Amino acid sequence: MQKICRIALAVSLSVSFSIGSNYAFAQDEALNEIPLPALAPETQHATASKRIAARFTRGHYKKVKIDDALSQEVFDRYIKQLDYGRNVFLATDIAEFKKHSLDFDDVFARGKLSIAYSIYNVNMQRRLERYQYALSLLDKDIVSDDKAQQPPFDFTTKEVYAYDREDAPWAQSKAELDELWRIKVKADALNLILAGKEWPKAKEVLTKRYKYAIKRLKQSESEDVFQLVMNSFARVVEPHTSYLSPRNAER
């Protein structure tokens, strides 16, 4: 009887593992098939941005002059909010964006939001590429002679991971971004291992982390962009002021 129970338990566990694996695979496939949204301003955003700009220029306690200097400041803050660590955009992206840096007053004061949305869409694409690259690194783990999984990183090599890249130069090529992210993923893995996790568990944690980031990326909405643009403007005018979208205000 005990033998029969053990066999039944083994079969049950095997079936459960198979179902779980198939479900996880199906989820991954479903996520891969979801495209990035092509975000564009909604009808109400143009009116809202003009009203917000008017409130600041007419009703703020300090005089706000909408000119090229303010436009440049808002542009710089917008880019910083999109890529604070300078490990997503390429230098060529930034060079292209800078052509519109003095047009950002039209973005918030006249409701001509297409420039800001175009930049955001490029950011989403670059982030997707980075997370996909990070996942590809995790899949390169090594199987040792005793069949144990080992991390695909050499932790005996002396390398430096720069956490603060706020003032770092923009990457000149995809290869340069890849190297930045190789070291980032290596640092993420090392932190988990130092916290006591074996590599298989650390890999699982990082895989879930990067896949969740992709999922969140693909759930981006037009209102997310609008809030970021308006916050960039508001915080240049007054560092302690924020714009909260109606959707987020209800949470």
Locate predicted features.
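Bacterial N-terminal signal peptides
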Residues: 8-20
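Flexible, low-complexity junctional segments that flank or bridge functional domains
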Residues: 4-5, 25-251
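Bacterial N-terminal signal peptides that target proteins for export
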Residues: 1-9
